[in-house]
Structure formats: structure tokens, C-alpha cells
Amino acid sequence: MQKLAELYRGKAKTVYTTENPDLLVLEFRNDTSALDGQRIEQFDRKGMVNNKFNHFIMTKLEEAGIPTQMERLLSDTEVLVKKLEMIPVECVIRNRAAGSLVKRLGIEEGLSLNPPLFDLFLKNDAMHDPMVNESYCKTFGWATEAQLARMKELSYLANDVLSKLFDDAGLILVDFKLEFGLFNGEVVLGDEFSPDGSRLWDKKTLNKMDKDRYRQSLGGLIEAYEEVAHRIGVKLD
């Protein structure tokens, strides 16, 4: 499948059209960003690692009955995906307290959350992705009640599948974000799942193995990503 025109360039991925109007090429770049894109650096191998990591995770989720946009790997940094009508809201599942939740509520980082929390955020970098709720989504037309219910259902199902996957690999799935879109009217998981959009801690040491290593200037970003990939069985080379 040949990529044609650039359709959209995000903070770490570029989307291209193809000769099939229902399919796109998603290219993972080496860019890494923080502070809503205000801080950007390049890291060798990152695009390749995230592409193969994402393909591996999406395959696992498909096997669990979660519809995804994934079609097939095209290269080390490119994947063929369905063209979705994206819903402009991020779904976040939280199994442990971290990030904005800790700042917002003043609770201890790492606090176990049972049952896991489900949050919604409007995708808007200029507004720093404000937290919203289902009422906002329905009033402003971002998603219908049925779509929201399906997004929530699929997010919790993904959490069940991935929490076990990472737990078996000696890792804690602290939290993660998912984005959904519509394909022929069906709610489908889009975008990506990688250490860029999730928090993963080592079970024994609680070392951070995700993009917090970049956000908090801890170093060893790609080494951590590759270690996580290796533990869960992603073939990188």
C-alpha cells in the first residue's frame, strides 16, 4: 500500500492518505514531546519501537474482541490503518494515582484505585486537554450516549486484558489513554497504545518505564521502552 499525501502531522506521528479512501498510513516518528508539544526532542529508534509496540498491543486487543483500526504493519515505522471519524475525546483509565490526578486531588502517587477510575478529556492542546464529563460530550455533540457507553465498555475491557499482560511481565499498568473513532458507524479503537500514552512501573522497584522518564528528565527513555517491549514479547529487530 503506497502512501500519498500528508493528511495530518501530530506531535509524534504523521498520517498519510492512500489510494484506498478507507485506509491510511500511520507513520511513527522519533519525536518525543511534553508540555502539550512545547518541548520536543528526537530519540533514535523511538518511532520503530512505538510502531511495533502499538501493533503488538492492538493485536492483543483485537484477539480479546475489541475492534481496532489496525490493518497490518508496513515497515519498521509505518502501519496501515482504517480511516476513522475520530471522536475528539480521550478516555483515561487509572489503576493507580499518578499525573494530573495527584495534582488535582492532592493524593499520594501510587495509591491503588479500586475500582479503576474512568476519565474523559477533550483533545485540545491549546486548552491543555481539559477534563470533561459525559454531559459535556452530549451537549456539545462530541459523542452520543451510546458511543460514550461503548467507549467506556471497551476501555475497561482493554484494562482487563492489558493489566494482566503487563502484570505477567512484572509491570504495573498505572494508567493509560485511549482514543476512539467511528468506522461505518461502529466505535473502533484508534490512535495508538504505547509507553507514550500510558504509565508503566516496574513491580519490584516502582521504576517508571514510560514517557514520565522524559517529562521528569530521568533519562533512559528508549532503554525503558525497549525493556517493556522485551518483557511483553514484542519483536523489535
Curated annotation (Swiss-Prot):
Q: Do you know which CDD domains this protein is assigned to?
A: SAICAR_synt_PurC
Q: Name one GO cellular component term.
A: cytosol
Could you name the domain of life of the organism this protein comes from? Bacteria
Q: Which reaction does it catalyse?
A: 5-amino-1-(5-phospho-D-ribosyl)imidazole-4-carboxylate + L-aspartate + ATP = (2S)-2-[5-amino-1-(5-phospho-beta-D-ribosyl)imidazole-4-carboxamido]succinate + ADP + phosphate + 2 H(+)
Which EC number(s) are documented for this chain? 6.3.2.6
Question: What is an example of a Pfam family matching this protein?
Answer: SAICAR_synt
> TM spans, by residue?
none
Q: Name one GO molecular function term.
A: ATP binding
**Keyword annotations from UniProtKB, A to Z:** ATP-binding, Ligase, Nucleotide-binding, Purine biosynthesis
Pathway(s) the chain acts in: Purine metabolism; IMP biosynthesis via de novo pathway; 5-amino-1-(5-phospho-D-ribosyl)imidazole-4-carboxamide from 5-amino-1-(5-phospho-D-ribosyl)imidazole-4-carboxylate: step 1/2
Q: Name one GO biological process term.
A: cobalamin biosynthetic process
Enumerate the NCBIfam families for this protein.
purC (TIGR00081)
Q: Which family, according to the similarity comment? A: Belongs to the SAICAR synthetase family.
Q: Check the record and name the PANTHER family matching this protein.
A: MULTIFUNCTIONAL PROTEIN ADE2 (PTHR43599), SI:DKEY-6E2.2 (PTHR43599:SF3)
Output this protein's name.
Answer: Phosphoribosylaminoimidazole-succinocarboxamide synthase
Species annotation: Yersinia pestis
Q: Which gene encodes it?
A: purC
